[in-house]
Amino acid sequence: MLNPNGAKIILGTPSSNSLVVPLTPSATTMFGPRGACLISETGPLWVADTGHHRLLGWRKCPEVDTQPADWVIGQSDFSQEGQNANGTTTAATVSVPTGICACGKGLAVADAWNHRVLIWKQLPEDNNVPADIVLGQADFSQNESNRGQSETAADRMHWPYGVVYHQGKLWVADTGNRRVLMWQQLPEVNGQPADLVLGQANMNCRDENGGGEATAASMRWPHAITFWGNNVPQQYGDRLVVTDAGNNRVMIWDTIPTENNQPCSVVLGQSEFNTVQLNQGVYFPSAASLSMPYGVAAVADWLIVADTANSRLLGWRDTVDIGTPAVALIGQSDFQSKGENALSLHPTRQSLCWPYGISVCGNTVVIADSGNNRVLLWSMNF
């Protein structure tokens, strides 16, 4: 699935053999990055440096390990950290930024602890470029969950961790409200309400698993979203894929949902729609089990899942059914192992520690290897 030699570029740590410790902010360090997006194969690259509450940008795709970032958004300079730059919430601050994606000609970021999604209409090309649009809040100065209300709505969010833009539609994993929101077109005004909801019966509900046991429609902790091509795309189009980390599963819709609370077609990681245990109730994982899967991406006929708490990536190809086992593995020696960095004292170019986010651009898979405070650029092995 990925090149067996390991990551071609490592960003964020001095070397692949360094001990993992919290790092002070600089142009080369990261602290628990949870998302990254390579806009084109030549760059730019944007990273959600989550623990430092900032976004880091590279003008071109990095060519050497620990290459320093060119831009920072969210802090006054590369040496600073703190939620909302230790001040008030603005169009150029973030608090626990997580999901990040190309969005039209610009960029979208799930600014999780500000309970909002930020949209730049054009790609930022400087430090602290302010966002143009905010979703989940009425304006850029607000940051309360669900706009300070106990009930949610189509224009509110609570801990949104995932965002993706696909074929003109914007999708957000509104994680704390246990749902996925969709906008039919790229929003143009602040606080624009979503058009469709998955995981809940309507826009006002927010109970985990809809207030009952898990079903093909319910969610507990949706985190990341991608689209996986079908074998017959001209007939079926893309499949929607959502990681439901709280239910230790990945949900797949065979076609793009068109109705609120539409049930998924298949789950991976569980044998039934109503089972939810991590690693299917046993200590060690298998090729068919998951433990808090946070990230997901698709490239060609591959679906790649960050099985986060098992510190590994799993790969599926082509067609899947409920509980289909993975056919590819990265980060562990076998499907029954789950140690951080494969139980090695130091991270290596092939190891992972709590990988949170994955994205793909061309032949390059970008992995937010959060527990190792680094981002990996790793080539596919077609």
Residue ranges and their predicted role:
Residues 311, 354-382:
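Blade-level signature of beta-propeller repeat domains, shared across WD40, Kelch, NHL, RCC1
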Residues 50-51, 60, 112-113, 122, ...:
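Short loop/turn segments immediately following the C-termini of beta-strands
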Residues 44-47, 106-109, 169-172, 233-234, ...:
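Conserved beta-propeller blade signature
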Residues 58-66, 120-129, 183-192, 253-265, ...:
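Short loop/turn segments immediately following beta-strands, especially the blade-tip
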Residues 3-26, 69-90, 130-153, 193-216, ...:
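Surface-exposed loop and turn segments in beta-propeller and other repeat-based domains
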Residues 22-38, 86-103, 147-165, 211-232, ...:
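Signature of short aromatic-glycine-proline-rich micro-motifs recurring in repeat-based ectodomains
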Residues 53-55, 115-117, 179-180, 248-250, ...:
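Structural signal for beta-propeller blades
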Residues 294-317:
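Loop/turn-rich, solvent-exposed surfaces of beta-rich toroidal or solenoidal domains
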